[in-house]
Amino acid sequence: MSDDARFQQLNCWLDSCLPELFVAEGWGEVPPAELIPASSDASFRRYFRWQGGDRSLVVMDAPPPQEDCRPFVKVAGLLAGAGVHVPRILAQDLENGFLLLSDLGRQTYLDVLHPGNADELFEPALDALIAFQKVDVAGVLPAYDEAVLRRELQLFPDWYLARHLGVELEGETLARWKRICDLLVRSALEQPRVFVHRDYMPRNLMLSEPNPGVLDFQDALHGPVTYDVTCLYKDAFVSWPEPRVHAALNRYWKKATWAGIPLPPSFEDFLRASDLMGVQRHLKVIGIFARICHRDGKPRYLGDVPRFFRYLETAVARRPELAELGELLASLPQGAEA
């Protein structure tokens, strides 16, 4: 279906569901409104803002078969039940991939973050993280298991090395890569398992009341406890000095331990697990950004790849067990991270 036909279908759905919604919510008559693009992301989803009078709603367009709204609806219920501020689902057409949502605002954390307000904004983000980590999702959400971890890691050699750089791993280099993957997967699987958002980063946190409004949670899994907090402070689009990251991770570790979240018993053990979890994610994201460029025709994400190589270099310098990863990265063509 063309974008124009899809947009027309979306408008027809809104025309059918808005009158009933306005009656149910006691909002009166549906006013004249406009539907304007709100955002898009690295997937096939699109978002529009419906604006009529003084009311603003958000429409998610998640076209099947590439996208499925059902996980979003399910996870939204889990998060709301934990007291996390997520969009209300006001109307839904799961078969056609349409959701009508409450509007959590127009500014993300990424839009407003700076060194002077970071602690003030991150503190409620940590509280929300701990709140949903308390939810028992074993058997409720899919497992972040070995197969998923290895499939994510494989994005790096398949899409970044082979497709983007033209580098094929073979012989001892391939053996080295396999040992790196074994180390990262083993570390992830040894961690306590909790609710994992998977993209808990400033771009997906809204400046809202209360802070933060949480978005983009549809890919949540039951997995390693360090994943989301590592993602929060080692972000795709904004970086922080290492001493600040260290202090923030220590603050999370203390708060989460006090709250009863299962964690490595010492902060040093936690920090090592976070470093290795971060490496797994950084390699995955580099591969994803290359795939988005070459498969989906969206090259802009490659501009943030150097940030992830810097994260990798920091972890390699701190962790002797990552020496083979350092050797592999050093063997790549000059300027490969650009």
UniProtKB/Swiss-Prot annotation:
Please indicate if the UniProt record lists Transcription as a keyword: no
One MF term in GO for this entry?
Answer: ATP binding
Write down the chemical reaction(s) this protein catalyses.
N-acetyl-D-muramate + ATP = N-acetyl-alpha-D-muramate 1-phosphate + ADP + H(+); N-acetyl-D-glucosamine + ATP = N-acetyl-alpha-D-glucosamine 1-phosphate + ADP + H(+)
Pathway assignment:
Cell wall biogenesis; peptidoglycan recycling
Keyword Membrane attached: no
What parts of the sequence cross the membrane? none
GO terms, biological process: cell wall organization; peptidoglycan biosynthetic process; peptidoglycan turnover; regulation of cell shape; response to antibiotic
- Among the Pfam families in the record, one is APH
Knockout consequences: Cells lacking this gene accumulate MurNAc. Deletion of this gene increases fosfomycin sensitivity. Growth rate is not affected.
Q: What's the EC number here?
A: 2.7.1.221
Q: Where is the signal peptide?
A: none
InterPro entries listed in its UniProt record:
Aminoglycoside_PTrfase, Kinase-like_dom_sf
UniProt keywords, alphabetically? Antibiotic resistance, ATP-binding, Carbohydrate metabolism, Cell shape, Cell wall biogenesis/degradation, Kinase, Nucleotide-binding, Peptidoglycan synthesis, Transferase
Give the family this protein belongs to, as stated in its UniProt record: Belongs to the kinase AmgK family.
Purpose of the protein: Sugar kinase that catalyzes the ATP-dependent phosphorylation of N-acetylmuramate (MurNAc) and N-acetylglucosamine (GlcNAc) at its C1 hydroxyl group, leading to MurNAc alpha-1P and GlcNAc alpha-1P, respectively. Is involved in peptidoglycan recycling as part of a cell wall recycling pathway that bypasses de novo biosynthesis of the peptidoglycan precursor UDP-MurNAc. Plays a role in intrinsic resistance to fosfomycin, which targets the de novo synthesis of UDP-MurNAc.
- Record's protein name: N-acetylmuramate/N-acetylglucosamine kinase
Its source organism is: Pseudomonas aeruginosa (strain ATCC 15692 / DSM 22644 / CIP 104116 / JCM 14847 / LMG 12228 / 1C / PRS 101 / PAO1)
Q: Which gene encodes it?
A: amgK
